[in-house]
Amino acid sequence: VQSMVLTACKRGDEIILPRNVHRSVLNALVLCGAVPVYVNPEVDKRLGISLGMKREQVAKAIKEHPNAVAVLVNNPTYYGICSDLRAIVKMAHDAGMLCLADEAHGTHFYFGGGLPVSAMAAGADMASVSMHKSGGSLTQSSLLLTGPNVHAGYVRQIINLTQTTSGSYLLMSSLDISRRNLAPVSYTHLRAHETLANL
């Protein structure tokens, strides 16, 4: 997440994001000096949980802060709530902004049909996917996915600033094994989970 934010933002840049972001996003803002423009998601009064950002809230933030360089979305939130990601990506791009996604709890979106759209399928520019949370890889391992609007060489440069240059082959191999395990069986497993959830 830090590398994603540091790739998109420089000192003084504004970034639009929900108030319920992970602290790693806030740490990235401290490191790069970017200025947060918070969108306050509504709270479901019955469940007492924060919801996702509404299209109208994002549109208002973009209109009020046209010089922002990026919009960051939780996809999904910690509680599994998804925003209208396709619409938010389009709004960001129409305004000349990048769209970044924290997919800490959205690993499964890449491996099964009938699920909410993954950030990259929605056209986001970057997504941080925490395979270790719901994909089965070792703790601390995650994927940083990039789209065509982001220069991969620059991303590598930022990663080298924030992380060790001696990557853990144990962590990297656990990512690959988890991806391999999820791909062929994902549809069957996700349908079984969906069936259980609907009981």
State what each model feature region is.
Residues V1-S3:
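Short loop-beta-helix segment that forms the pyridoxal 5′-phosphate
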Residues A8-V25:
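Conserved PLP-anchoring active-site segment centered on the Schiff-base-forming lysine
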Residues L17-P18, Y38-V39, L72-V73, C99-E103, ...:
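General beta-strand structural signal in soluble alpha/beta enzymes
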Residues C32-G33, A95, A122-G123:
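Short, structured coil segments at secondary-structure junctions
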Residues L47-H108:
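Active-site phosphate-binding strand-loop segment of PLP-dependent enzymes
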Residues S118-Q157, Q163-S174:
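Active-site PLP attachment segment
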Residues S173-S186:
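Amphipathic alpha-helix from the class-I
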Residues T188-T195:
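Conserved small/polar residues in nucleotide/adenosyl-binding loops
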